[in-house]
């Protein structure tokens, strides 16, 4: 059964059942349906290229863990929650890298002058 209509994609129970069964067409339909919205959502916190990476990572995670998806959970809600958390993790990671870089610059500044 392919999911070609918006109505089909929004039928959470059907989508989860198809994903659990390993339906690649269903996954691709979900990917296409949610991609832009998820990228836009993630770009609230990170640049668009980073947002696109986060969305790809999220969709890969969903596919790799499809057998653990539960029909009672909203796929849309899950996707947006994962994207938000990954975006905030990326910000946190960037801050740590920036802080370490600044500390190293201060520590070794005299050696390079």
Feature-to-residue mapping (PLM):
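Internal acidic/polar
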Residues: 8-12, 89, 97-113
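Arg/Lys-rich amphipathic alpha helix in sigma70-family domain 2
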Residues: 67-70, 81-102
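Extreme N-terminal regulatory/targeting segments of RNA polymerase sigma factors
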Residues: 1-17
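ATP/adenylate-binding site constellation spanning eukaryotic-like Ser/Thr protein kinases
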Residues: 32-36, 56, 84, 93
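Alpha-helical structural segments
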Residues: 29-33, 107
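Short, charged helix-capping/linker segments at alpha-helix termini
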Residues: 3-5, 20-28, 39-57
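Structural recognition of an alpha-helix C-terminal capping motif at a helix-to-coil junction
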Residues: 40, 53-60, 64, 73-85
């Amino acid at each position: 059964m392919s999911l070609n209509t918006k109505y089909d994609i929004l039928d959470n129970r059907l989508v989860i059942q198809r994903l659990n069964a390993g339906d690649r067409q269903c996954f691709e339909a979900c990917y296409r349906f949610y991609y832009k919205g998820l990228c836009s959502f993630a770009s609230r916190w990170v640049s668009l290229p980073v947002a696109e990476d986060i969305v790809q990572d999220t969709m890969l995670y969903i596919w790799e863990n499809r057998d653990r998806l539960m029909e009672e959970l909203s796929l849309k809600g899950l996707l947006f929650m994962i994207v938000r958390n990954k975006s905030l993790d990326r910000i946190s990671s960037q801050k740590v890298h920036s802080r370490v870089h600044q500390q190293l610059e201060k520590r070794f500044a005299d050696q390079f002058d």
